[in-house]
Amino acid sequence: LARISRSITRRRVPAAAAVLPSRSADPLLRLCTFNVNSIRARAAHVARFLERQKPDLVFLQETRCTAEQVPAMEFAGLGYKTHAVGQAGGRNGVAVIARIPFEVLAEALPGDAEDSQARYIEVAAAGIRAAGIYLPNGNSGGDAGFAYKLAWMDRLRHVVQARLDAFEPFAVLGDYNVCPTEADLAHGALPATDALVHPESRARFRALLHLGMTDALRALHPNETLYTYWDYGPAFEANRGLRIDHALLSPELAERLEACEVDTAPRAEAQPSDHTPLIVTLRDT
């Protein structure tokens, strides 16, 4: 496996020391997740999205480059600071882009010191903790690849449990590579054997909800057909998609949930990512 291009922070930071003061200028906080499928190829797409939606904090997945190769200056001109966790070889990679102050708490998911894949970043900002994740797909690598996915989800559950036990306002946004139910994919979009719909993948996603996390989109849109991913080709025009990008909120943040939307505009652009942004709006405390 390729090595992460920045040092990994595995020490848990106490909430009192890590969480930054809440902003007072704006009563709303807008968080976003966006799998860009190569940040260097999609930098202009991201910049247009930032200009149009003006989110406060954005988690990116599948940046597909080292941290130093992320085009941070393109976003700095719009008032956004970038922190990336990269990986050589054009694989994986996550980043956070924010126009509000933030502190990086972790650059790797705890629980496996040998895991060098760039899939997790956790920050403190605006009085909350938030993590951006790129959960393993699980379809490649045979049985070992699927086992890695399940183990990764188990590690994530332990992190979420710790945050909930500490009563910390916590959000986990990203590409989960899981369709939680049959309502989260177009009919016939995936075979029943696919790792994104496998019963064990879905069970581990439900386990996060059973801990007390809230699926932000389904909390506000329980019955709507909403997708965040469409394969290249005619899938987008036919709305033959998947809902695999999610925002899960702790009880403290679920109480503040104002809106959650899928922004399909970036997916409709020329040469887009196969994903599109998911935006969560939280009321101030």
Where are these regions (language model features)?
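N-terminal, active-site-proximal structural segment of metallo-dependent hydrolase catalytic domains
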Residues: 2-94
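Short acidic-hydrophobic surface loop/beta-edge motif
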Residues: 22, 121-125, 280
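Active-site beta-strand/loop signature of hydrolases that rely on acidic residues for catalysis
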Residues: 31-35, 46, 50-68, 130, ...
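Structured beta-strand-rich core segments of catalytic domains in phosphoester-bond hydrolases
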Residues: 63-66, 70-140
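Metal-dependent phosphoesterases centered on the DNase I-like endonuclease/exonuclease/phosphatase
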Residues: 74, 78-79, 152-246
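Conserved beta strand-loop-helix elements of the APE1-like EEP
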Residues: 89-104, 235-256, 282-283
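Surface-exposed cleft-lining segments at the edges of enzyme active sites
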Residues: 110-111, 135-153, 189-194
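Surface polyanion/phosphate-binding segment centered on an Asp-His-Pro turn
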Residues: 261-285
